[in-house]
Amino acid sequence: MNTPIKDFTDNYAKSGIIRAHMPGHKGKFPLTEFDITEIKGADSLFEADGIIAESEKNTSEIFHSYKTLYSAGGSTLCIFTMLAMCLMNGKNRRVAAVRNCHRSFLNACVFLDAEVEWIYPEYENSLVSGKITPEAVERAIEKSSPACVYLTSPDYLGHITEIDGIADICHKHGVMLLVDNAHGAYLNFIGEPPMHPNYHGADMCCDSAHKTLPALTGGAYLHINNPKAEKYEGYAKEIMSMFGSTSPSYLIMRSLDECADFMDTRAGKYFNEMKLAADKVKSLLSPVWHIEDTEAGKLTLFTPPCGYTGTELADILREYKIECEYADHTHIVLMLTGLSAEEITYKGKGISNLPQPSIFVPT
């Protein structure tokens, strides 16, 4: 696959041209030679019709979306944009949202003056995770007649919501389904059909490429899928420009461009090997440790049955040179995407060798 942003910045870095433009580093410091601004030929993220538009089209084909737009402001920018696109007519400010959402959704609702009808997941060991059913979504739609339904899948502990049934309910009522898939960009390469929301009825969704793919922090995608969403597509870039920086990082955009080439040529084999290694580690640990049923790229342990709090276990693993993604009183989460099979196996063995505290159970 061609990499137009990478190719342009490579050629510019080699050109020897005097950079009488921003940024102030002028490409003379480490990591800065490819960091440019909207010079001639470099396109512009929010008015893309050149190399950025071409790169976005490449990524859209990989994700089988109607349209994919780049964000250098993470999924936060995509979430603000999705909600604004749904609420832009001003007639309906209501959003039905699953309560275990990221704070960027809350911030967007405050900024956009949205009215939220909360959908509460069924409690399952944690306040940040829980099962959500199509029936619960339908009750919320019938109660509030929202402009859209918003859910997070995978959630922070790695649990995936069955989106198909929820999408059917939303579309039966003529309501848009928005999915915060920030932790699940790599799901485009797992399963048949892939587990990514694009394949299961999401009208729009966001991916934080930097969370699970080889992209720089802040690199994200906004996917537009449903024909009903197409009428908003022309406004998407304009809305993104309202919330995003007018100086989006070319290093981030270059990394998204190179990521497209990685996904096109190597991602299928890479993530299949990761899943096989992760499955082996989960099988190794499951006889002793309480392993949650999660997405392939997360190893989530429910720690109380093993005599630890999640934060205690995180401190112990740090001594083994393993830094986890998240820990609280009851859970610990390790992200496996981006690791080699050997690194995943090392993590598993490190956990399996930990001593089990004795737990006194009164009779």
Identify the meaning behind each predicted range.
Residues 42, 69-71, 149-152, 333-337:
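Short glycine-rich or small-residue beta-strand-to-loop segments that form or flank ligand, phosphate
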Residues 32-77:
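Conserved N-terminal alpha-helix of the aminotransferase class I/II PLP-enzyme fold
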Residues 2-9, 62, 74-290, 303:
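Conserved PLP-enzyme active-site core in the AAT-like
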Residues 1-50:
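N-terminal "arm"/small-domain region of PLP-dependent enzymes with the aminotransferase-like
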Residues 283-363:
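Conserved C-terminal alpha-helix-loop-beta "cap" of PLP-dependent enzymes
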